[in-house]
């Protein structure tokens, strides 16, 4: 009988310890997410950021997982880069299986809604692109989506990934158009 009570108490102690561990993990993850959000917000305010995309959504809803170091949208002051590179057997114009466009960013606007979500919009003008770029970042996260809306055709594309300060970005830029 004493052994039974000891076993029950021991299992309850383990359960409480596990729950504490889960709560601690959740609190640590929330703190990390908040820190990454603040870092992304500062990078956006300074106009020195990169969205490293790990997923691409195409015009009709199909999607593909892609490499985040070759698929990105970046801004450094008034200079913008949009690069997409797919895992295909041919090299494409940028040498990576996609396109890389350098351009000038204009009409840069940042808005924060009542819930703290951030919306960034800008126009990117380059040799191979003239597009509206819209970035949405939900409050408390550095995960974001970017909609690329070309002005000359209807090849709408959406990328999703993480917003990082330019100095922390790990991207490989291909040949520009």
Enumerate the predicted regions with their spans.
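Bacterial Sec-dependent N-terminal signal peptides
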Residues: 1-20
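Residues that act as N-cap/strand-start positions at coil-to-secondary-structure junctions
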Residues: 36, 65-69, 102-104, 116, ...
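Helix-rich interaction surfaces within compact, conserved domain-sized segments
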Residues: 19, 39, 107-177
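Sequence-level detector for tyrosine residue identity
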Residues: 10, 57-60, 108, 139
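N-terminal secretory signal peptides
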Residues: 19-91, 157-159, 167-175
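Mature extracytoplasmic domains of secretory-pathway proteins
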Residues: 73-117
């Amino acid at each position: 009988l004493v052994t039974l009570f000891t076993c029950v108490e021991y299992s309850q102690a383990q359960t409480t310890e596990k729950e504490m561990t889960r709560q601690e993990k959740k609190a640590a993850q929330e703190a990390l997410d908040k820190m990454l959000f603040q870092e992304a917000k500062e990078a956006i305010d300074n106009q020195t950021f990169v969205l490293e995309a790990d997923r691409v959504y195409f015009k009709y809803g199909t999607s593909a997982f892609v490499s985040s170091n070759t698929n990105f949208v970046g801004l450094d002051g008034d200079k913008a880069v949009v690069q997409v590179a797919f895992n295909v057997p041919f090299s494409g114009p940028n040498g990576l299986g996609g396109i890389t466009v350098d351009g000038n960013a204009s009409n840069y606007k940042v808005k924060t809604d009542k819930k703290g979500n951030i919306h960034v919009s800008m126009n990117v003008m380059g040799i191979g692109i003239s597009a509206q770029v819209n970035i949405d970042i939900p409050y408390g996260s550095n995960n974001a989506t970017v909609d690329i809306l070309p002005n000359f055709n209807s090849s709408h594309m959406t990328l999703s990934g993480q917003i990082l300060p330019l100095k922390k970005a790990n991207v490989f830029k291909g040949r520009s158009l």
